[in-house]
Amino acid sequence: MNKELVLVVDFGGQYNQLIARRVRENRVYCEIVPYTTSIEDIKEKAPKGIIFTGGPNSVYGENAPRVQKELFDLGIPVLGICYGDQLMAHSLEGEVTSPEKREYGKTDVNLDNSSLLFKDMKEKDQCWMSHTDYISKVPKGFKIIATTDECPCAAMENAEKKLYGVQFHPEVEHTLFGKKMLKNFLFNVCNLKGDWSMSSFAEQQIKAIKEKVGDKKVICALSGGVDSSVAAVIVHKAIGKQLTCIFVDHGLLRKDEGDQVEKIFKDQFDMNLIRVNAQDRFLGKLKGVSDPERKRKIIGEEFIRVFEEEAKKLGDISFLVQGTIYPDIVESGTNTSATIKSHHNVGGLPEDMEFKLIEPLRELFKDEVRAVGEELGIPHKLVWRQPFPGPGLAIRVLGEVTEEKLAITREADAIFREEIAKAGLEEKIWQYFACLPNIQSVGVMGDERTYCHTIALRAVTSSDAMTSDWARIPYEVLDKVSRRIVNEVKEVNRIVYDVTSKPPATIEWE
């Protein structure tokens, strides 16, 4: 099945992934590509529509991102957002001006609903603005289709060429008509069908993996988390016993997790599974290391080394499966965005790795991965398992990792997860865990002074891990968790709850 494709061209905006999610919510497949993508590559991909993202630059900046003018003559509908809107105008000989003050926040906008872009919408609504420059003169063949008090051209169109630009951000919730507008672009302008689904995605991946692998042997980096589990099942459905799953028990797992992983994949899925006990090896490499980036790199490299050693025992192995997903790629940096932190599935890979990668989920957000898992018949409990980073508890123990610190974190985390489950909050909270900051504090237990560790509890609500908010857990649940941890984990005398959203914080502490 040939899927309809929309290209999201990345100019470095903070909402790029959100644009992609909005497109996919309409059952339309999209890919994010850098603005440096050539016309030839775009033609080869044959998209049905193109969306330019926003970005931090001015079109007059010395190193401002550009596109070839020929792109606007391909006959492919284009929607420019914010910087993408200004770039379209600038490229087609319109004029972009820098005003005395910027326009930011919720803004009333006047819409021309005779335009296909604003079909069936109110004439006045609310949008979200975040710009300094604006279009002061539209290019030849264009007309203005939206205005605000501060922005004489809040949107423009060349309906004949199917070129559209909006100065506001339709992808964010604060633009009340944004989802409807994007839907109009996809279905009224691009004439798409919206027939992409998780079942069709799984079918396409299984077919592609069969063709790519042939009769070669494959190993899978299995952690037991949602991402690697779904990746393993997709590949197993494609090639069966040609796949061997290697589960590295690095001693950085949650309580009883190693045994649970082994049971699920051996008993329920009948997969070839090798469990490698490598705790001493990993802790030895991590000894004396406090920097979180170094910890991630060390763990990523050791993972690959273990796989290489196991592969040699198995014979001729050609491919390695990883559960990399879209947010992993974004957080590891692109041509137009800074690196937030290197991801264990991306930045930690050694350059001399001997395997070719299979990453069947690299185009999906977490909620889409779960949907694929359900399609594949993976048990609901496993599909909705808590997200868990590849480096495991090593990045939830701040500073140097030791067996003692791991044991403290593991027990506190188990109590937190148990009480969340008892309260019926498991599927209402995206992610929740305990971590061990490198902090000790004075306390009193009985009649004695204590000087013990602090445990930080982190719980967030999200749909894709790109943004998140701290979870409003009932006080009585937090109270019970706190009392249990300080009573059952003797090395702890203080519990704190993290009430920071993402951004500015990331979900994990390291």
From Swiss-Prot:
The active site is at residues 82, 169, 171. GO terms for cellular component: cytosol. Pathway: Purine metabolism; GMP biosynthesis; GMP from XMP (L-Gln route): step 1/1. It holds the Pfam family GMP_synt_C. Residues 196-385 form the GMPS ATP-PPase domain. ATP binds at residues 223-229. It catalyses: XMP + L-glutamine + ATP + H2O = GMP + L-glutamate + AMP + diphosphate + 2 H(+). One of its GO terms (molecular function) is ATP binding. Gene3D superfamilies: 3.30.300.10, 3.40.50.880, HUPs. Its EC number is 6.3.5.2. It comes from the Bacteria. The keyword Flavoprotein does not apply. Residues 5-195 form the Glutamine amidotransferase type-1 domain. Keywords: ATP-binding, Glutamine amidotransferase, GMP biosynthesis, Ligase, Nucleotide-binding, Purine biosynthesis. NCBIfam families: guaA_Cterm (TIGR00884), guaA_Nterm (TIGR00888), PRK00074.1 (NF000848). Catalyzes the synthesis of GMP from XMP. Homodimer. This is GMP synthase [glutamine-hydrolyzing]. The gene is guaA.
